[in-house]
């Protein structure tokens, strides 16, 4: 934490230099309210809720150059933008602890909304092969005011959570710059979420196998899927143990799935090894998108990417 505070201080000192030539900062119209998002999903939700009213706002996403959220290093410009936000929407996990430091060091006066403070967060078990429908007790979800280090950060990958988040964000935006259209747009967007969710009913064998990290626990919970993964959450581990490799290979051998999964930025070498060790053939390696490192310019929205993810699961869960 000391190191992080030193970094924050250094960034603060650098701000005077950074004021010149800042991209998003120079585009902030001081006459408009500003909403700042740290992730792609939040940013897309805000745009859909605002609709045509987006022209009345400065809508900014930091970390829009494709950097993974778990390794993102905030810039001096990020710090200044946060200080100017009327609404700040962020994930709230340990990867964004710097956000808390930024709000404190910049005397943040806006309204902050952390996703993990407005859902039932999932605790990351420190294991590698696990059936994903083991739910924690409500006591384990008491987290407000405490570190989120032990919780899965990828709450946006639950369509059920997305509905709650959008409703909250709509109300929050209305508090800052009232408009009757936010609620209407939000309801229309939630209808689309419900429609998407209703298209996918997985019956029979509901095992999914990830020869990679596993940021999709929230999605698995939505559809009551069993999951087996090489690493829990977005673990920093890079080498799967022999026991993990053996377990994944055994599950592949037993289930004979049409495919096993890796993340959008994942290396498929482990997946190839798992398939080879299983002795099975004609098993596809399928990528799914966690939306945690999407660069500016992405033409697909949250719902389109979630539909692609669910279609990928459907290939295996027939």
Pin down the residues of each PLM region.
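Sec-dependent bacterial lipoprotein signal peptides
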Residues: 1-20
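Extracytoplasmic metal-acquisition and chelation regions
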Residues: 9, 19-318
